[in-house]
Amino acid sequence: MAKQLVFDESARRSLERGVNAVANAVKVTLGPRGRNVVIEKKFGSPTITKDGVTVAKEVELEDKLENIGAQLLKEVASKTNDITGDGTTTATVLGQAIVKEGLRNVAAGANPLALKRGIDKAVAVAIEEIKKLAVSVEDSEAIKKVAGISANDETVGQEIASAMDKVGKEGVITIEESKGFDTEVDVVEGMQFDKGFINPYFITNPEKMEAVLEDAYILINEKKISNLKDMLPVLEKVAQTGRPLLIIAEDVEGEALATLVVNKLRGTLNIAAVKAPGFGDRRKEMLRDIAAVTGGEVVSEDLGHKLENVGMEMLGRAARIRITKDETTIVDGKGEQAQIDARVNAIKGELDSTDSDYAREKLQERLAKLSGGVAVIRVGAATETELKEKKHRYEDALSTARSAVEEGIVAGGGTTLLRVIPAVRKAAESLTGDEATGARILIRALEEPARQIAANAGEEGSVIVNAVVGSDKARYGFNAATGEYVEDMVAAGIVDPAKVTRTALQNAASIGALILTTEAIVSDKPEKAAPAMPQGGGDMGGMGGMDF
């Protein structure tokens, strides 16, 4: 396919038009008085949302060059959302402001590369200031506030804080759709994995279709068990204690499974068997996690263990085990805390070094199962459209709460970005030429989120910004929800996670500065429409004038 090439100012202005198209649609959602955006869907009801990244993802422009600019700004929103789950609208507004101010200076003759260096240096200073202003999150009240602001709903904040209280800050919290109108929080205590009983004859409670083992031993075997002779010694030892036994293995089959079922039916031994969770290397690690929680050892050929030689000291213990057809929950395992902590620290080390989102998600699941438990928030609503929108807000609020726990909170409402301006201005004074201009571009952009929040609340943005910047109180700001100035935004509960503010600024500056240094665009040339098919003759040639 033929390509079209566009250069210089024409290329940059095309990108700017695309950036503006996305930003103008997204920024109306910013702040407590931000408006909704309705998104048409090809199938089903339209989506109504106040989430910046959802709006940004739907924007596709007809002009190919402008669409490239739109895609670049969408990347800012998506990247910010992937890392923190919030701050997408702030990032979009910052990106638009950097592009607008930057291109004005490039058109006036400034060196784009020097501007980029100045912006990068100013961003580094701003991030250090944000870290200094951050306050660590110690209690559920702060989590409630930050999650409530993200969702624009105090009830959402309350439920997220309640769930984090129950399962711990490292715990797994999942958001699901409820079949009813009400939203409820269910907490699963202990370690849960998604494998159920191998055979329904292991069920102890036919009404609930579940097997419950009290004060049970746990045999954790890495390989399949099919030979009865290998398993017989450990079965005899457990039978002498009179306690139940759970077998976790890659699989249990053949005569081994038949013997277990027969012993269960005769009442000789209260026993159940489940398949090991996960696959490959992840399965090995998950079995070691279970061993740490229960105080047992994994029977592994890699470590020189053989099933026929397993002693009672290698078996794990748990106060209660509940098994359904789909999942197994181990409550109150008897493992030593030191071993569990060692596993937790090892997983945290892997989390820091991995680049894969999928691997990170699985590691966080393992971490949560070791740390406390799993909470499920089932979101209810009257209609499907409301349910989708509400579920999305819960997901955003949860990500925001996690970010707050990670790096602390700062004053919200765009206040923190205004508070870092003096430090950036001081840094700009040490720069020269176009680098200093680049730093000043960032200073102007830092004002934009507060301006937009005020504008969406029906106030004059410049007046609000000047009033906040003019105050010598570090947390003085404007509460757009009430239209009043606040002495201490953090005390008033108007907060943002420091990680969200930092990530939004970094991503916006990254894409904004790249657009300034663009000198040419190569894109597909629009295809000419194919000529229309010629119309057929009136009398259809020699068909003899067919009559109808």
Swiss-Prot record:
User: Which SUPFAM superfamilies does this UniProt record tie to the protein?
Assistant: GroEL apical domain-like, GroEL equatorial domain-like, GroEL-intermediate domain like
- What is catalyzed by this enzyme? ATP + H2O + a folded polypeptide = ADP + phosphate + an unfolded polypeptide
Instruction: Recall the GO molecular function terms of this protein's record.
Output: ATP binding; ATP-dependent protein folding chaperone; isomerase activity; unfolded protein binding
Q: Report which superkingdom the organism of origin falls in.
A: Bacteria
Major localization listed first in the record, in broad terms: cytoplasm
Top EC class, one word: isomerase
Q: Which Gene3D superfamilies does the UniProt entry name for this protein? A: GroEL, GroEL-like equatorial domain, TCP-1-like chaperonin intermediate domain
The Enzyme Commission number assigned here is 5.6.1.7
Q: Which GO terms describe its biological process?
A: chaperone cofactor-dependent protein refolding; protein refolding; response to heat
Q: Which family does it belong to?
A: Belongs to the chaperonin (HSP60) family.
Oligomer and partners: Forms a cylinder of 14 subunits composed of two heptameric rings stacked back-to-back. Interacts with the co-chaperonin GroES.
Question: Under which name does UniProt file this protein?
Answer: Chaperonin GroEL
- Species assigned in the record: Deinococcus radiodurans (strain ATCC 13939 / DSM 20539 / JCM 16871 / CCUG 27074 / LMG 4051 / NBRC 15346 / NCIMB 9279 / VKM B-1422 / R1)
Gene, per the UniProt record: groEL
